[in-house]
Structure formats: structure tokens, C-alpha cells
Amino acid sequence: MNKDELKAFVLANPRLVSMKPAGDGIYVLKYSKRVFYEDLWNDFLEECRGTIVDEDFNVVSRPFTKIYNYGVEAKAPVLANDVKVTAYRKANGFMVAMTWHNNDILVSTTGSTDNDYVGYAKEMMLKHMCWEDWVLAIASNEGHTFMFECVHPSDPHIIVEKTGMYFLGWRENSWDSRVHGFDCDTVWKIFAQDTIKCHAVESYHMTVGELVAESKRVRHEG
């Protein structure tokens, strides 16, 4: 992603994406509801799902790029039934990103650094370990963004999920980074359970055909 092209797009399209101030010269990029309902996604908007940038659009925090629903959205990948994949159970909560910024943990959701959901996330973080231990874990990995699914009792869903933080993966704070975690099961599960003492989502190795069939039987979200 070219940061100058992204900045030009964001500034030229306020009806499609907001640039919400988050203090100290940083901004949260968030797509509008119109993008979601009218399926207006493009390469720029795919990155505007809670990414935090400075005034020059250098990355401060970079959560997931948009992931398309397989078999539902037109831009989702198309794979043959015999292709082998690794699937991860989707925890039923809301996305949280963390990075080290200005000598503290910067916690954010897909659109804010100071809403109720950020408060919920911080509350759930303390169920796993004390704030000082979180500071040590995140500060020792400065320059990276860590992604979680947070399940909080004040954000109920039809499918009941165990409360807490579910570690999903991490990536470097740069525009050319890729998400890590999904390609190294053992390492990231050890990090989730031993270093940050969070839940780790289950993974399954199977073919696409087997996965599609299994998705019709399971009772969790996806």
C-alpha cells in the first residue's frame, strides 16, 4: 500500500472513510456504513478497518486488512474442493488491536481508541494478567500490532462464548507487512497461552470441501 495514495483517497472521500482524531497527532481510519451496505470495497478501504496513522500516514497500529466471506462476497478467493487449508474457529466477540505507542499500550477497536468497547477490552485484559505484565509483553514487541477477539458480557451474542481475550495474530507496523500467527500454530499458541495468558482459537487442517461441509454442521459463529 502506498501511504501517499491512501492519504489522497481518504481526504478526497469523506463519505466513504473517516479520519477520526485519536490524540497526539494520530488518527483512526474507519470505513463508512455505506461501504459495507453497498459493497464499495477497494484496495484503500480494505485497510481502513481501524488502522491508526500519523499525519503523514505512517502506520501507528495496523490490524487486519479486510477479509472477505468465502462463498459469499465476490472478492473472496475461489479454491478447488481438494485444496488443503488451515481453518480457525471464529470467536464471537469484537476485534481489538494493541501496539506500543508513546510509552504505553494503545488499545483500539475497528473505529476508536476511547469508546466503551476499548474499556471492555481493558477489563478483559486484566482477567488474564495484570496491566504491568501486559506492558512488558507489548513493549518488548514494539513496532508490532497484536490482534484479538474480545468477548465481554456487556456485548452479548446469540452464540455464547467464554469471556476474555482470544489472540488472533500479529503484524509489523508497516504498509508492506503481513499477518503472522496463522502460519505457525505452535509458536503463536505458546505466545497466547504462556506469554500473554490469553485464549487461543482452535485450528483445523482439512480440504476446502471438508471445511465447507463442516461449516454447515458447527454451532459456533464460523
How should each PLM-predicted stretch be described?
Residues 1-222:
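Core nucleotide-handling region used for phosphoryl-transfer chemistry
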